[in-house]
UniProtKB/Swiss-Prot annotation, chain B:
Source organism per UniProt: Gluconacetobacter diazotrophicus (strain ATCC 49037 / DSM 5601 / CCUG 37298 / CIP 103539 / LMG 7603 / PAl5)
BP terms from Gene Ontology: lipid A biosynthetic process
Protein name: Acyl carrier protein
Record key words, sorted: Cytoplasm, Fatty acid biosynthesis, Fatty acid metabolism, Lipid biosynthesis, Lipid metabolism, Phosphopantetheine, Phosphoprotein
GO cellular component terms, semicolon-separated: cytosol; membrane
Modified residues (O-(pantetheine 4'-phosphoryl)serine): S37
The organism's taxonomic lineage, starting at the top: Bacteria, Pseudomonadati, Pseudomonadota, Alphaproteobacteria, Acetobacterales
Record-annotated Carrier domain positions: 2-77
Function: Carrier of the growing fatty acid chain in fatty acid biosynthesis.
Pathway(s) served: Lipid metabolism; fatty acid biosynthesis
Taxonomic superkingdom: Bacteria
Gene3D superfamilies registered for this protein in UniProt: ACP-like
Pfam families: PP-binding
Compartments reported by the entry: Cytoplasm
Length: 410, 79
């Protein structure tokens, strides 16, 4: 597994900072946000690799960097960590053909598209880089990962806004179940913290603007003072492998994907339906495919974006768990890293697996005054030690698309 | 070496990320300097920009080596 996020570089570095209750949110540093309503975001810290920060040239050769948008850079960083961690180095042509890639993104190369638009607008269309299109295309993370490692199996991608990461992992696991591949590198990557991205989500009234002076307090899922999400950037990548295949080669196995459910709201382009019934149906489908009871789930990593929709998700989760609601912990790790859009679901699925490994529920930061009371423990402020055998992670996207994934320790 | 040759060499080093010593006049962009077809398109654009010249597509296709580029630009500049 591999992560690059506003908490930094690397799986264990991210996890230890998350459990310690640290925040990766700050004032936007990559450009001057003064003209925009929202001034805060979660950006991947630049700096030395050994300090858990990103030095891009350690991961992507300088001459290749300009051929890819930043979301591809971040995807390659996390994919490199994940592939190395998995120890999977297919030597034979057959093994390479049985290894695929499915990495999604919600937005793709937004800054690249912006820059190219300016070039064309200035009447310099003939000066447009030949790398513009392959730099911006969402499936090019999968493309670059396959080229880097020689993975010749299914090469696919997912675009379902903020549900892309979960859909990619879920769909990739289904490809393995269907026999299309033995190994799939899957996840999501996003880098939309740029003027166009911030302006666009601001215009949709989706971003927090009330905490510009106190960035670390801006992402506050379920808190009564929340006023929108905080955008984050990064990538989360996992290596999925057919169980017997992984066992046979003595692979390090973090966990098993046991359930996956999807649904559509058929309601509104950005708002969830009443009671988040689409989320309920996605979770229900995941529980059904896992063949478990909701009460078997010890931890829920919520979509919980720090918007009004948080309480609707809460209602849907309460409905799913019924009388077992008081037994489950649910937190939103977006409180620490912001909303990584198309990478969110992948990073959060990884956090869910680590929650099982270490029997610890990561905290929901800034949950000072819940807007709604609930029997569900939302792990306010501090991580909690508790027995977690099975975890569920939710992701919902614009367009009314919902995905839930259920993981178990091995 | 001419001023044009110096500048061409610099652009090649920068765009292809290769050692300066490898950028000899005879070096082929694709065979010796690791460029692909998209790299060569970008390289020609960089020459056009840097020397304020137009390099039409049929001429660009014939620019395979560092010397080809230098000769073409020198000819344009002399005209």
């Amino acid at each position: 597994m591999g992560i690059v996020s506003p908490l930094g570089l690397g799986l264990e570095h991210n996890w230890s900072r998350l459990i310690a209750g640290e925040s990766g949110i700050g004032r936007i540093a990559s450009f001057d946000p003064s003209d925009l309503p929202a001034h805060v975001a979660g950006e991947v810290p630049a700096g030395p690799t050994e300090a858990g920060c990103l030095t891009l040239s350690d991961w992507v050769p300088v001459k290749d960097q300009k051929k890819m948008d930043r979301f591809i850079h971040l995807g390659l960083v996390a994919a490199t960590e994940a592939v190395e961690d998995s120890g999977w180095k297919p030597e034979s042509e057959e093994d390479r053909c049985r290894t695929g890639v499915m990495i999604g993104s919600g937005i793709g190369g937004l800054q690249t598209i912006y820059d190219a638009s300016v070039t064309v607008h200035e009447g310099r269309a003939r000066r447009l880089s030949p790398f513009f299109i392959p730099s911006a295309l969402i499936n090019l993370v999968s493309g670059h990962v396959s080229i880097k490692y020689g993975f010749k199996g299914p090469n696919h991608s997912v675009v379902t806004a903020c549900a892309s990461g979960v859909h990619a992992i879920g769909d990739a696991s289904r490809l393995i179940m269907l026999g299309d591949a033995d190994v799939m590198v899957a996840g999501g990557a996003e880098a939309a913290v740029c003027p166009l991205g911030i302006a666009g989500f601001s215009s949709a009234r989706a971003l927090s603007t009330a905490f510009n002076a106190e960035p670390e307090k801006a992402s506050r899922p379920w808190d009564r003072d929340r006023d929108g999400f905080v955008m984050g950037e990064g990538a989360g990548i996992v290596v999925l492998e057919e169980y017997e295949h992984a066992k046979a080669r003595g692979a390090k196995i973090y966990g098993e994907i046991i359930g996956y459910g999807m649904s559509g709201d058929a309601y509104h382009i950005t708002a969830p339906a009443e009671g988040h019934e689409g989320a309920y149906r996605a979770m229900q489908a995941a529980v059904r495919s896992a063949g478990i009871a909701p009460s078997d789930i010890g931890y829920v990593n919520a979509h919980g974006t720090s918007t009004m929709a948080d309480d609707l998700e809460l209602q849907a989760v309460e409905r799913l768990f019924g009388d077992a609601a008081s037994q489950v912990a649910m937190s939103s790790t977006k409180s620490a890293i912001g909303h990584l859009l198309g990478a969110a679901g992948a990073v959060e699925a990884i956090f869910s697996i680590l929650a099982i490994r270490d029997n610890v529920a990561p905290p929901t930061l800034n949950l000072d005054n819940p807007s709604t009371e609930s029997a569900i423990d939302r792990v306010a402020h501090e991580a909690q030690r508790r027995k977690i055998d099975i975890a569920l992670s939710n992701s919902f996207g614009f367009g009314g698309t919902n995905a839930s994934i259920i993981v178990r320790g091995v | 070496m001419s001023e044009i040759a110096d500048k061409v060499k610099k652009i090649v080093v920068e765009h292809l990320g290769v050692e300066e010593s490898k950028v000899t006049p005879e070096a082929s962009f694709i065979d010796d300097l690791g460029a692909d077809s998209l790299d060569t398109v970008e390289l020609v654009m960089a020459f056009e920009e840097a020397f304020s010249v137009e390099i039409p597509e049929d001429a660009a296709e014939k620019i395979a080596t560092v010397k080809d580029a230098i000769d073409y630009i020198e000819k344009q500049k002399a005209a």
